Amino acid sequence: MSWKTYTVKEPTELTVSKYVKERFSLSSRDIQMMFRKKRVKVNSRVAHSQRALKKGDVLTLELPQDKDYGVDVEKGPITVLYEDAHTLVVNKAPFMLVHPAGQTKSCTLSNYIASYYAKKGVVHKVRPVHRLDRDTSGCILFGKTKEAQQYYTDELQAGRIDSIYTGLVEGRIDADGMVDVPIGVDPVFDNRRVIDEFGQSAQTEYTVLGYEGDKTLLRFKLLTGRTHQIRVHMEHIGHPIIGDAMYGTRNKPYTRQCLHASELTFVPYGKDEAIMITCEVGDNFGRE
């Protein structure tokens, strides 16, 4: 383990222990161990767990190493798009959950990534920075360390990670545009989202790329990151995503939801320059 230094950049009323727990998603046991072994300092002095932090304080700590992957290790195919010591970007296949949820404990992307780490002889908890819907394919970002995951979470919340999607929608759209309507949780089915004037603000830009008969191929840029945002917005303007069973209909000859995370732009943890990761739709949206 090595010491890491962070400056508290925002006003806070949290104690040192609460700040460290929230920022690095650590367990109470890990927090207690760190303070017991004097692995937390504030302004170069060993810190008490209940010390109040303030903006400008310099926090130095030794984070515990991962002891497991956080999910079951299961061999499966993954396509790596970018990797360094702190970061992993892969191409998620359609019909796959990013992380175990509910009754699904296996055959997820995270299970396969755990196997990928194990094969390389390293132990990292599998830490997805964001999610893609089960039927959506494309670029997805993982932080290998607690520090990298928190960095990317902060970057995402600050709008400094750009996500671009490619999608095929019903009907012909003649011009580029933007949908700017709030999204909330469906009052009946909590796994669905609906347009809701009291919901969270949501903005989706779209650019026309071309046409396939009476369908339009679009490039989407998310200005916000709400659950099912593109799918809900396109259904709202009368052009649902092809193959979207929840907000549209299944459409032959396409065998899956025609939405793909095609581009991700971000500054990697520990580096200064932004990179752009691209990933083409490899299966033509499963067209038969």
Predicted regions and their residues:
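RNA pseudouridine synthases
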Residues: 1-288
